[in-house]
Amino acid sequence: MSLKELEKKTKWIITKKKGAKGPDGKIKVISMGRLKTGKERLALYIPASSNVNAFLSMVDKVLVEAGIIEDTGEILLKLTATDSQEGYTVTKQKTGGITISIMRIANKLGLKRGITEKEHEIDLRNKTVYILFPNPNDS
């Protein structure tokens, strides 16, 4: 089943609104915590070798949707290229990787630092990247 099909089974909790190198070339959660402003922060690291990196390097901002797949408890993130003010900024790192700092999302999803993606898929026509993370409770 493709990740795009999984989208239909996902109960979206967060919908569109306002570092460390992974040796395996996978997308990884690298940092999270509260900023001084009280906002939560979750930074994704997307390695330079990743095809997602190649796609996102052409994009300045992404809308982020995130949800939990009801059957498995896995977490699906959907990043869609946008010009909107509400998008999150895509930051290119010196290492060639890319990070996206996503506010207010970390704790609602139960994502923890160090979690590595299970798989990802790019839908070029809709300028969207799907990233599937394992169920954080299956450790």
Feature roles, as predicted:
Residues I98, R104-I105, L109:
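Pepsin/retropepsin-fold aspartyl endopeptidases
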Residues S49, I69, N107-R113:
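Short, structured coil/loop segments at alpha-helix boundaries
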Residues L42-S49:
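Short, well-ordered beta-strand segments enriched in hydrophobic/aromatic residues
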Residues M1-E40, S57-T99, R113-S139:
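Long, compositionally biased stretches
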Residues S50-N51, E65:
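Functionally constrained cores in energy, signaling, and assembly domains
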